[in-house]
């Protein structure tokens, strides 16, 4: 099973990705975690990433694409995966489609988790990440509207999009996702 989780920052994509990877025995690939590891290790790429994330900006596609390409080529990703935090725009979606076609591992489903904006704001402010200040949250939500919302139409046209109400307990959201992917 190869899945993508979409939704605004704070809808619980990371939580759901972990649950789904355990339930389905597939790999959880978090681009956010890949980025944070680079920053924590203070690699040259990590220092570039740090500047973008602390400003609340999206990391350039070229950086994300290079990191993900390497990860998808590792043997454990062939069993299946759930992508958390990628793609975030149409360019990345096109890249991912091409990459998965080359690897002969097409996507099975894209899950869009929907949560009311007030709930999202509360969740983001409570998770105590350095990059979750009110200013960066507002900016990231605006970027999401501009860059990521078009992905919903993209995957709807591809016939693999499922919409999930994420305004529930994590367990209930997991059950809803599992029910829709069969």
Show the residue positions of the predicted features.
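Glycine-rich phosphate-binding loop of ATP-dependent small-molecule kinases
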Residues: 1-182
């Amino acid at each position: 099973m190869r899945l993508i989780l979409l939704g605004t920052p704070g809808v619980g994509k990371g939580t759901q990705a972990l649950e789904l990877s355990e339930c389905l025995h597939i790999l959880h690939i978090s681009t956010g975690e890949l980025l944070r590891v680079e920053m924590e290790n203070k690699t040259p790429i990590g220092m570039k990433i740090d500047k973008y994330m602390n400003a609340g900006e999206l990391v350039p596609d070229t950086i994300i694409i290079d990191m993900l390409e390497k990860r998808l080529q590792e043997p454990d990703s062939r069993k299946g995966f759930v992508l958390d935090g990628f793609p975030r725009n149409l360019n990345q979606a096109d890249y991912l489609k091409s990459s998965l076609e080359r690897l002969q591992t097409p996507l099975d489903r894209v899950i869009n988790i929907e949560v009311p904006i007030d709930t999202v704001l509360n969740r983001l402010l409570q998770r105590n990440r350095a990059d979750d200040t009110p200013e960066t949250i507002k900016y990231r939500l605006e970027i999401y509207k501009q860059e990521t919302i078009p992905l919903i139409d993209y995957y709807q046209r591809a016939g693999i999009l499922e919409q999930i109400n994420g305004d529930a307990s994590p367990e209930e959201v997991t059950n809803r996702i599992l029910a829709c992917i069969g």
